[in-house]
């Protein structure tokens, strides 16, 4: 196939760097955030006020990390740098100053790809979207249906302040959801006189009722107000004026306890039209008075006061890595402060040094906790490059300080008009997290306040000005403008052609003449996320199916020989490049050396730049990471040129699947209910073969009875089972292993109690110690097989960090090639997913007029009800492209080039393809897009023409090999004695309540009985049944299930006299099969208790 790619539509501009969100945020943390925290934190004074410790934040430094990224991954270490900061200890009495550089902890560093390496695993810190600090006005209806208004002042950290109106026109205030207090009591406590307040209000007559109410309660002075405030906030403690003063001061006016943040100050100033400087981060009297004034205006419906919509993106902000890390550092420093104060008090004042005061542990622990166990620090999804990229651009409303799944209602999850161009309306999970986890739209970026912005071109006098950089607007700024969509038609000078243009203005749609338009969107793709923008013709798909398509592209397994799509959208190159999977040239120059492992580019000055390639490494999801060079020796390269393909990339473009020939027709019921019928060609030609690498690990520990040993000398194992082990007992690289094979031989010392009776007898007779060890080797689990590709041995002598108690750790990596097979899940890019039901020989597949057999047969009934017609456009456009020997790029939302443009373009290409010599049959004008196929088994034509074409189909990570599972005998749960569940535990299938009903409905009494007893938790019964089966005897009657005995015991332990009786009233002893020698009944009865006493 030739490499010419035809561009059907041009996007306006290149996309921004797609991982910028992560990198910019971490850069801000290193340059500003960390310094800010260290400086806010000092000085620390001891309780007597003699000593002061200052942290000089601007002079902090980071040492070079101990390991580089690759080394850290290999050693299971963290890629981190040591932080040092200059501390100054000032003795106020003597004036002595001691200055010293102090180690304050390790800080994990971000790699170039926007990830962190924590304990050898790549992790991503997901961005969190939370309610922005500021002031919010809401209305509520009371019990009588009357509207009341309230205002909440929400800080970044500190106490919430909420003002409310009631039906008597009184104003109340709550601090942190405590009891209501008359608002004027708070004013008086803050030291404001009645006139101070009244002068600030535009409608003071409403407020005078609250003043009157305060006077009626007998609270007329500041001192009385402070006492009242203390009583309400600290009920049960003896109130005092000084206590009230201190409480108020620390709650709202102390910068250490109360912080609006830069954003909160900006939002309050904007909403209340104040001009308080950015540096004032606490509440001021002006804030409180303006809030009351605004609330009264709302109540009286004057002065243009408006309510706030908390789901509007102007009121929600993104907290990225930098800020989340900054908050965590603050937690650590607060813990550190307590320790320092204690040490200052305890230690000898003269001999103290900063290094003795500062203990790095609390800070280290706080940072470690954040990276290791925070909800927002996630194991990176490395299934393929797209999954990796999307994970870094994810925005979650969950996590600390955010929402919980249960609490989140429909309003939070819903698409909001302000999401346009900021959050993708399509890409979100299905299920309980729908709408809480979103993806950043393609062109969106996060500004310094944490609000999401999206770019526009300015429009002046009806002319779009595409000069220089586009203008970025946040959601609340955009509301004030009239914004036209990105697909408006313009002439070559940029003049808008139509007479009336649909625009968005204040979250509504109107039509205005071009002269009134303020801005035009940059590109039609900017509304959707990266994954969605890779779906061609997405505008013809129902949103639910586009959602599935976006999510399933992230689950595509990288194939052995990837192939880029015939029909793409033009974003494939950028996705591959920004995912970090493909090495890129940093300079202009010439390739001077290429092999499978490395590429050297020599720049024009003669400097050499080495690019190491990843070879067959295991990803977090057990898929295979591998890079293949695509440049040759002597090639000239420029900055930004792709030098090698990563996994699921071809020619520098992302290639998640294969282009295969697809026919939409039923075939003998094998594609009923979304099943897929495939040709043997996909198996034989390795079209959908992927490499998976499993990691197996074993550690030799120190036990009470002595150390475990990794060895070849394993008791009771035949020599042929040890054939592939080396002299240490570790499998050799290159060996082929199957389930049950030994990978690493290990023996554990065993105590006296572990010895079977025959061994005890032998020892008694011969007095010789049989080797007191038991086999505890690492074996290949059931259903797994493959080739050993790598073995790594970690010991303390080599300087590796091992888990406590371990002397040696051995890791074995086993790779397997998985061909496609029945039961594997496949999908297109339009949410058309299915399971392979049968693999047919090539000669039995339906074939085209030129004799080509099709690769996949899909059910046509999968299209109409699901309304994902984009797959049909892709199919036919792919058919045309394959016959024209080219590749096509189609940008989504192509109506700007005219109505029905997709339809016209596809038709045009098909006609073009049919003009090729010998290809007249490719397009039949009477039945456009369909061909007459013949049955491969009989050679007869099918009665109806069939839609045939090339589509990009993916193999998903849900492989049948990982899911298929069977159990004959296996482990049981300790308490209930029922089989464990799940493949990993070698478990059984759960027979739940509804399955029992099904068996009851058919009267299958014996089947049901043995499922509930012999096959589950009747301990004696199952042993007897197994014996009977082995010996070929009839299976005996089942006994009592263990779970019934547990239930009886629980009821008896509640003091209930419960027993099981036969029809004749004779008590049945449930416990008799447990201990046959026991004479007492299964529970104490009066008779048995009496007999016990007589024996005594």
From Swiss-Prot:
Disulfide pairings: none
Keyword Chloroplast appears in the UniProt entry: no
Any GO CC annotation of this UniProt entry: DNA-directed RNA polymerase complex
Family matches, as PROSITE patterns: RNA_POL_BETA
Chemical reaction(s) catalysed: RNA(n) + a ribonucleoside 5'-triphosphate = RNA(n+1) + diphosphate
Disordered: region residues: 1069-1096
Record has DNA-binding as a keyword: no
InterPro entries documented for this protein: DNA-dir_RNA_pol_bsu_ext_1_sf, DNA-dir_RNA_pol_bsu_external_1, DNA-dir_RNA_pol_su2, DNA-dir_RNAP_su2_dom, DNA-dir_RNAP_su2_hyb_sf, RNA_pol_bsu_bac, RNA_pol_bsu_CS, RNA_pol_bsu_protrusion
Any one biological process term the GO annotation gives: DNA-templated transcription
Assembly and interaction partners: In cyanobacteria the RNAP catalytic core is composed of 2 alpha, 1 beta, 1 beta', 1 gamma and 1 omega subunit. When a sigma factor is associated with the core the holoenzyme is formed, which can initiate transcription.
Protein family according to the UniProt entry: Belongs to the RNA polymerase beta chain family.
Protein name: DNA-directed RNA polymerase subunit beta
């Amino acid at each position: 196939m030739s490499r010419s790619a035809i561009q059907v539509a041009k996007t306006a501009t290149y996309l921004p760097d797609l991982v910028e969100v992560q990198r910019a945020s971490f850069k801000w943390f290193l340059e500003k955030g960390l310094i800010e925290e260290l400086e806010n934190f000092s000085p620390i004074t001891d309780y007597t006020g003699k000593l002061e410790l200052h942290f000089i934040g601007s002079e902090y430094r980071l040492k070079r990390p101990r390991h580089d990224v690759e080394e850290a991954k290999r050693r299971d270490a963290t890629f981190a740098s040591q932080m040092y900061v200059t501390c100054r200890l000032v003795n106020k009495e003597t004036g002595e100053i001691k200055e010293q550089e102090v180690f304050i902890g390790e800080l994990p560093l971000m790699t170039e790809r926007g990830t962190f390496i924590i304990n050898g695993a790549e992790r991503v810190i997901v961005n969190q979207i939370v309610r922005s600090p500021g002031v919010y006005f809401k209305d509520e209806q009371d019990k009588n249906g009357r509207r009341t208004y309230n205002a909440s002042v929400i800080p970044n950290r500190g106490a919430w302040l909420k003002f409310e109106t009631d039906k008597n026109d009184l104003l109340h205030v709550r601090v942190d959801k405590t009891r209501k207090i008359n608002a004027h009591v708070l004013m008086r406590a803050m030291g404001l006189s009645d006139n101070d307040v009244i002068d600030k209000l535009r409608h003071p007559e409403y407020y005078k009722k609250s003043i009157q109410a305060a006077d009626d309660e007998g609270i007329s002075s500041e001192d009385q107000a402070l006492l009242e405030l203390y009583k309400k906030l600290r009920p049960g403690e003896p109130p005092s004026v000084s206590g009230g003063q201190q409480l108020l001061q620390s709650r709202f006016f102390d910068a250490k306890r109360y912080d609006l943040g830069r954003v909160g100050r900006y939002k309050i100033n904007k909403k209340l039209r104040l001009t308080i400087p950015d540096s004032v981060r606490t509440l001021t009297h002006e804030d409180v008075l303006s809030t009351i004034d605004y609330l009264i205006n709302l109540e009286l419906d004057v002065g243009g006061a408006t309510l706030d919509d908390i789901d509007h993106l102007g009121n929600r902000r993104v907290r990225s890595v930098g800020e989340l890390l900054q908050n965590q550092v603050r937690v650590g420093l607060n813990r550190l402060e307590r320790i320092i104060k204690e040490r200052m008090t305890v230690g000898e004042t003269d001999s103290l040094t900063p290094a003795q005061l500062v203990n790095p542990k609390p800070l280290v622990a706080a940072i470690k906790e954040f990276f290791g166990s925070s909800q927002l620090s996630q194991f990176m999804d490395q299934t393929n490059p797209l999954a990796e990229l999307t994970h870094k651009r994810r925005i979650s409303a969950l996590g600390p300080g955010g929402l919980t799944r249960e609490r989140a209602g429909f309003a939070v999850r819903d698409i909001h008009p302000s999401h346009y161009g900021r959050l993708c309306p399509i890409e979100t999970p299905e299920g309980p997290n729908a709408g809480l986890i979103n993806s950043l739209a393609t062109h969106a970026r996060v500004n310094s306040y944490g609000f999401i912005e999206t770019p526009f071109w300015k429009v002046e006098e009806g002319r779009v000005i595409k000069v220089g950089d586009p203008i970025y607007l946040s959601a609340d700024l955009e509301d004030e403008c009239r914004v036209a969509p990105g697909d408006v038609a313009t002439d070559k000078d940029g003049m808008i052609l139509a007479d009336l243009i649909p625009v968005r203005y204040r979250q509504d749609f109107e039509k205005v003449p071009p002269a009134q338009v303020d801005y035009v969107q940059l590109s039609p793709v900017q509304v959707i996320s990266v994954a969605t923008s890779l779906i061609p013709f997405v505008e013809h798909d129902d949103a639910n199916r586009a959602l599935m398509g976006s999510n399933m592209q992230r689950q595509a397994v990288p194939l052995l020989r990837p192939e880029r799509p015939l029909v793409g959208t033009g974003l494939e190159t950028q996705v591959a490049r920004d995912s970090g999977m493909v090495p890129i040239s940093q300079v202009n120059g010439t390739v001077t050396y290429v092999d499978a492992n490395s590429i050297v580019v020599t720049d024009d000055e003669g400097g050499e730049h080495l690019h190491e390639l990843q070879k067959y490494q295991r990803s977090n999801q057990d898929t295979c990471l591998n890079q293949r060079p695509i440049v040759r020796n002597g090639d000239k390269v420029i900055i930004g040129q792709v030098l090698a393909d990563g996994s699921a990339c071809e020619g520098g473009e992302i290639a998640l699947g294969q282009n295969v020939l697809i026919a939409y027709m039923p075939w003998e019921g094998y594609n009923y209910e979304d099943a897929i019928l495939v040709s043997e060609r996909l198996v034989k030609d390795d079209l959908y073969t992927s490499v998976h690498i499993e990691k197996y690990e074993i550690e030799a520990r120190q036990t009470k009875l002595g150390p475990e040993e990794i060895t070849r000398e394993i008791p009771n194992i035949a020599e042929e089972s040890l054939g592939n082990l080396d002299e240490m007992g570790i499998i050799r690289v290159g060996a082929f292993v199957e389930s049950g094979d030994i990978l690493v031989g290990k023996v554990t010392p065993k105590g006296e109690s572990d010895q079977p009776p025959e061994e005890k007898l032998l020892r008694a007779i011969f007095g010789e110690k049989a080797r007191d060890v038991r086999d505890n080797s690492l074996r290949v689990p059931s259903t797994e097989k493959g080739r050993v590709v790598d073995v790594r041995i970690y010991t303390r002598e080599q300087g590796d960090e091992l888990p406590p108690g371990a002397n040696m750790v051995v890791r074995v990596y086993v790779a397997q090639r998985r061909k496609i097979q029945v039961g594997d899940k496949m999908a297109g890019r339009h949410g058309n997913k299915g399971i392979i039901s049968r693999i047919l020989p090539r000669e039995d597949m339906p074939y085209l007029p030129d004799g080509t057999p099709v690769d996949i047969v899909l059910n046509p009934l999968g299209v109409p009800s699901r309304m994902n017609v984009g797959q049909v456009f892709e199919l036919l456009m792919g058919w045309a492209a394959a016959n024209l020997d080219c590749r096509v790029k189609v940008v989504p939302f192509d109506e700007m080039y005219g109505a029905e443009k997709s339809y016209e373009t596809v038709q045009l290409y098909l006609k073009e393809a049919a003009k090729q010599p010998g290809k007249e049959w490719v397009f039949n004008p009477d039945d456009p897009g369909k061909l007459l196929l013949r049955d491969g088994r009989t050679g007869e034509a099918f009665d109806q023409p069939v839609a045939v074409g090339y589509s990009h189909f993916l193999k998903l990570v849900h492989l049948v090999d990982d899911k298929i599972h069977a159990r004959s005998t296996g482990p049981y749960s300790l308490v209930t004695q029922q089989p464990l569940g799940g493949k990993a535990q070698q478990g059984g299938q759960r027979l739940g309540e509804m399955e029992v009903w099904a068996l009851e409905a058919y009267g299958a009494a014996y089947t049901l009985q043995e499922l509930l007893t012999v096959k589950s938790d009747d301990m004696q019964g199952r042993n007897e049944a197994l014996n009977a089966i082995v010996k070929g005897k009839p299976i005996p009657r089942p006994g009592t299930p263990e779970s019934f005995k547990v239930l009886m015991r629980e009821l008896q332990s509640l003091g209930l006299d419960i027993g099981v009786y036969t029809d004749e009233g004779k008590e049945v002893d449930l416990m008799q099969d447990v201990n046959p020698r026991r004479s007492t009944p299964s529970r104490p009865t009066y008779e048995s208790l009496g007999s016990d006493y007589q024996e005594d």
